[in-house]
From Swiss-Prot:
Name of the featured protein: tRNA pseudouridine synthase A
E.C. designation(s): 5.4.99.12
Keywords recorded for this protein, A-Z: Isomerase, tRNA processing
Catalytic activity, as annotated: uridine(38/39/40) in tRNA = pseudouridine(38/39/40) in tRNA
Gene name in the database record: truA
Function according to Swiss-Prot or TrEMBL: Formation of pseudouridine at positions 38, 39 and 40 in the anticodon stem and loop of transfer RNAs.
PANTHER family per record: PSEUDOURIDYLATE SYNTHASE, TRNA PSEUDOURIDINE SYNTHASE-LIKE 1
Length: 268
């Protein structure tokens, strides 16, 4: 028996998220079926982050235990021959039995992409939110967001239906920047609440459009005014960039060669 880790990229447009659900098309379901074809028995998979319906991943991390003669570094090629073009295994490696895709991660990184141009761009439409009511003030958005860094109770940024015992988590870093017409919101945290990033982005857009002040934004989450947090950004603009570990087991995760070109920092 060996433990194998996968670095996975997927277009979540037509999937109901990562986690298996009854009568739903999910990433985990497709991957598990591919593993079943290889081994002829059920293999349990674990992910660094549970992406929701319509959310993408450029560097999702998954592991599973398997009793098979196939070398750990060969699973990428074997699985890619069985998976649809919307799911790609970028790298596969054998890891220690104690290593866990979810619990060994120091933090996770999500990026939200807003297309703030006057006109939609069909070439990036499935991976960004076209939002143009006015030019967004990304500096105002950044300043408003910075107070969220550190460990806080983000109850206001949690959708109903979560089974977490509490809403406290630690944001390691948050950044908002403009690359031409794209606004990139990057959040790195030890963990994320259900719907957290999309709710944060929805509120930050209101700040950028000067519909609410940074002070109102802060008041809403600090004082847990969940009923005032109604705007959730569409799923298609959200991407799970990667999970970061103290012991990095992958080679490709050290750089951005697996990240969509139009989302790379500084691209113009």
């Amino acid at each position: 028996m060996k433990r194998v880790a996968l670095l996975v990229q997927y277009d979540g447009s037509h999937y109901s998220g990562w986690q298996k659900q009854k009568n739903a098309n999910t990433i985990q379901e497709i991957l598990d079926k591919a593993l079943l074809k290889i081994t002829n028995h059920t293999v349990k998979t674990f992910a660094a982050g549970r992406t929701d319906a319509g959310v993408h991943a450029s560097g999702q991390v998954i592991h599973f235990d398997i009793d098979c003669v196939i070398p750990g570094n060969s699973y990428s090629d074997v699985l890619n021959s069985l998976l649809p073009s919307t799911i790609r295994i970028l790298e596969s490696v054998e890891v220690k039995d104690s290593w866990h895709a979810c619990y060994s991660a120091s933090y996770r990184h999500y990026r939200y992409v807003i297309n703030n141009s006057k006109f939609p761009n069909l070439f990036i439409n499935n991976w960004s939110w076209h939002r143009y009511q006015k030019v967004l003030d990304e500096v105002l958005m950044l300043n408003a967001s910075k107070k969220m860094e550190g460990e806080h109770d983000f109850f206001a940024f949690q959708k109903s239906g979560s089974n977490r015992q509490n809403s406290i988590t630690k944001i390691k870093n948050i950044d908002v920047k403009r690359v031409e017409d794209l606004i990139l919101v990057d959040i790195k945290a030890t963990g994320f609440l259900y719907g957290m990033v999309r709710l944060i982005v929805g509120q930050l857009v209101l700040v950028g459009e000067k519909k609410i002040s940074p002070e109102i934004f802060t008041d809403r989450w600090v004082n847990k005014k969940k009923n005032d947090v109604k705007e959730s950004a569409p799923a298609k603009g959200l991407c799970f960039v990667n999970a970061v570990y103290e012991e990095n087991v992958f080679k490709k995760i050290k750089n951005n060669d697996f990240f969509p070109i139009f989302l790379i920092e500084g691209f113009s």
